[in-house]
Structure formats: C-alpha cells, structure tokens
Regions:
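Short, basic/aromatic recognition patches
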Residues: 3-23, 145
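Electropositive phosphate-/nucleotide-binding environments in soluble metabolic enzymes
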Residues: 5, 9, 21, 46, ...
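Short, small/polar residue-rich loop motifs at catalytic or cofactor-binding pockets
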Residues: 24-27, 152-153
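Short beta-strand scaffold segments in enzyme catalytic cores
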Residues: 28-36, 157-158
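Zn2+-dependent cytidine deaminase-like catalytic core
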Residues: 32, 37-134, 253-255
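Short, structured interface segments
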Residues: 129-146
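Active-site ligand-binding patch in enzyme domains
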Residues: 144-146, 152-269
Length: 269
C-alpha cells in the first residue's frame, strides 16, 4: 500500500467485518501505520466487544509491535465516552499514537467533535475528512437518522414475472424468492433494527421474521413489528408463539378515536 487513501480504504474493508453484528453501534475499522506500513489492524467486531482502535492496539501488543509514534487511520471519529467499553480516545492516548487520520466525524450532534478535541488536547496531531464520502456511505442509515430524525426504511417485496406479490389466495402461499435472493434478504435483516409487516402477511405466510444465516453475534435480534389494526393475528402464528425474538403488535380498532394521530404516525414512520 502507498498513500493515505489506501490505508483508509483498508480500514473501510475491515469495518465491514462488523456489519450486522454491532447494532446499534456503527461499523468501524482502524489500521495502525509506521513508516508507511500497516503494523496492526482492528474493527468493531460485535456489540460489547473491543472497538476498532482498541482491537488494533491489542493486536499490536500481542505481536510485540510498539504503538508509540504510530499513525492511526480510523473510519469514524473515536468515541470519547464510557459505554460498554472505555473511550477509544483514552486507548489511543495510552498507546502513544501520535497522529490520527479520521474519515468521518461522528454524525451524532451531541458528541461530534468531542473525540478530536480530546486527542488534540492530549498532543495528538489529528486530520479529518479523508475519504469522508466513502466513510459516511458506510453508515448512511445512521447519517439519515441524525439528519432527519426519521428511520431509514428499506422496502422489500418478492414479485413474480407478472408483477404479483402473491398467487391465487385460495391456494397455499407460494415462495417467489430464489435461494440467492433469500440470502440477500437475511443480510439486510441482519443490518436492521426492526422487521415490519402487515397482518395479512402474518395470516397468509406465517413468517418467522428472524435473521437466519448471517451471524449477528450477541446483539439483539431485529424487533418484529406487525401492523394489526383489528387484532386479527392468529394465536398460533410464529410471531406470537416464538418468543426468543421480541414482537411489537400495533393494534387500533378506530384511528379516529385516537387523540394524537400525528404522534402515532411519527412513531411508525
């Protein structure tokens, strides 16, 4: 590799290893560089696990590679608060990293800039904005939330050659999806916080609405949400009897009777 952009691209590749496993956190990658060579790599692997910077520093320690004076290329501004793990800024300062190159600033306006300020106060040279578009694209769903305060919604539909989403309602439901498309569906589910369907889908297909295939680690499975205005959900349907994954049932027999319809709409959309 040669050039800063290549180091950041490698960090972006590493971040993808945490895709679907770190929710509600963001996928982050980090490489430590000395004399133009990567000496350690890290990524946020699973919820509650080491963050990317912490993993890279830990890898360097295991390999006996000194971190003092290294440069860290990180796809996202290092965190500066205690959560499930200590702050990444603290880890970088402890490791003696002298130069930090950040792809994207933290999109959360309540904490944005705190990480860079702490590092600079600790004597670290900080650069921002390297491959910022690519780094922001990697977390575009969260960027959408921070900018609009609305969830990022992905519509999925299995459609046959005639444009239908179902066959003859008098016959058992048919599956239009191929194995390849089903695999993609579960990858998308793994990268989501909720899976929403209408009551007719539950009655017709009796779906599990779970992630099957991708390893999402110890994070919570996506919440199952069923829009069932008139309480028609079958008591023996999978969303009702399979309790290993939480299900939110949305009932309302008369929307006109609700005093705060706009609030309900905001909560759903």
């Amino acid at each position: 590799m040669d050039g800063e952009a290549d180091f950041m691209r490698r960090a972006l590749e590493l971040a993808e290893f945490g895709r679907g496993r770190v929710m509600p956190n963001l996928p982050v990658g980090c490489v430590l560089v000395r004399d133009g060579e990567i000496v350690a790599e890290g990524w946020h692997d699973h919820i509650g696990g080491l963050h990317a910077e912490q993993m890279a520093i830990a890898e360097a320690e295991v390999r006996g590679v000194p971190t003092l004076g290294t440069t860290a290329y990180i796809t996202l501004e290092p965190c500066n608060h205690f959560g499930r793990t200590p702050p990444c800024t603290e880890a970088l300062l402890w490791a003696g990293v002298s130069h930090v190159v950040i792809g994207a600033a933290d999109p959360n306006p309540t904490v944005r800039g705190g990480g860079t300020e702490t590092l600079r106060s600790g004597g670290v040279n900080v650069e921002e904005g390297l491959l910022v578009d690519e780094c922001e694209e990697q977390m575009h769903e969260f960027m959408h939330w921070c900018r609009t305060r609305r969830p990022h919604v992905l519509l999925k539909a299995a459609i046959d050659a005639h444009g239908r989403i179902d066959g003859d309602p008098a016959l058992p439901a048919e599956r239009f999806s191929s194995e390849a498309s089903l695999g993609l569906v579960h990858e998308l589910r793994a990268d989501s916080m909720a899976i929403l369907v209408g009551i007719n889908t539950v009655i017709r297909d009796n779906p599990s609405l779970t992630v099957r295939g991708p390893d999402i680690g110890p994070r919570d499975s996506p919440l199952r949400v069923v829009i069932d205005p008139n309480c028609r959900v079958p008591g023996d349907s999978v969303p009702m009897v399979y309790c290993a994954v939480a299900t939110l049932m949305v009932h309302c027999t008369d929307l006109g009777a609700i005093d705060d319809v706009p609030h309900v709409v905001r909560m759903l959309l």
